[in-house]
Design a protein with these regions (language model features):
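Flexible loop/turn segments at secondary-structure boundaries
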Residues: 35-36, 71-72, 168, 220-224
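Short helix/loop capping segments that flank catalytic or ligand/cofactor-binding pockets
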Residues: 138-140, 159-161, 170-171, 222-225
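Conserved catalytic cores of phosphodiester-cleaving nucleases, focusing on short active-site segments
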Residues: 2-4, 13-36, 47, 216-219
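Conserved RNase H-like, two-metal-ion catalytic cores of nucleic-acid enzymes
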Residues: 6-7, 200-228
């Protein structure tokens, strides 16, 4: 059974795949990832909680299905080799009490008329982006001189600067802590002009041997390989 839906105590879940065996039903949570992450286990745990509380049928096992990144396609895809299928039964059973407690906490927050006091941080974007970023995060974060625009700066460091009242390039005093690229950003903003290092560009292009070809790994995002 694909996409079977269940609800218990206002908690709705949709199971990716259910398979009936002689020992009971096996539950499969399918992910387009190449490894199991902790929030995948909690996805499976909430499904386990709802199904156990409903007690409609016997559950034999629960699995998380991920992609095998060592798989190499040769004509027909072998699904057994293409997927990694791992039991997380012990994990979801261990998480059960925590999940029940978390549901109580979240229902309490949902019923309250007051917003929960939560600071902004990496948790706002991972594992999934929050829909209230425009409400909690600074209005100037997308401005060209916002510290949130620093190239390749860890999000925790950006937030640390912001919490210190340093929200724009002009307020950054510790220049030495920045990378050369980030310093260039500040200089380009200050001069209102791009920084073009022609000699550095020439050194790079002089090393290129023609004809040249490119293969962009990010062009294809399909989980199932298209080509052998």
């Amino acid at each position: 059974i694909y996409e079977a839906s269940f609800i218990f105590d206002d908690i709705f879940v949709r199971v990716d795949l259910m398979n009936k065996t002689e020992k009971g039903w096996d539950i499969y949570e399918v992910k387009s990832s190449t490894r199991i992450r902790s929030y995948h286990e909690y996805d499976a745990s909430i499904q386990w909680h709802v199904l156990k509380e409903l007690n409609m049928f016997k559950i034999n096992d629960i699995f998380i299905v991920t992609l095998n990144n060592k798989f190499s396609k040769k004509e027909i895809i072998d699904p057994i080799k293409f997927f990694n299928i791992d039991s997380v039964l012990d994990v979801v059973q261990s998480n059960h009490q925590e999940v029940k407690q978390k549901i109580i906490e979240l229902k309490s927050i949902a019923a309250s008329s007051e917003e929960p006091p939560i600071d902004i941080g990496p948790h706002c974007k991972k594992p999934h982006g929050c829909v209230y970023l425009d409400k909690c995060w600074p209005n100037n974060m997308n401005d060209i001189n916002s510290v949130f625009r620093f190239y390749r700066m860890n999000l925790k460091k950006k937030i640390s600067l912001y919490n210190q009242g340093i929200d724009t390039f002009e307020k950054v005093n510790d220049i030495d802590s920045l990378t050369s690229t980030q310093k260039n950003q500040m200089e380009a903003f200050r001069k209102a002009a791009p920084i073009i290092k022609k000699q550095e560009i020439k050194k790079f292009t002089d090393k290129i041997i023609y004809p040249i070809s490119f293969f962009d790994f990010e062009t294809f995002t399909d989980a199932v390989p298209l080509y052998d």
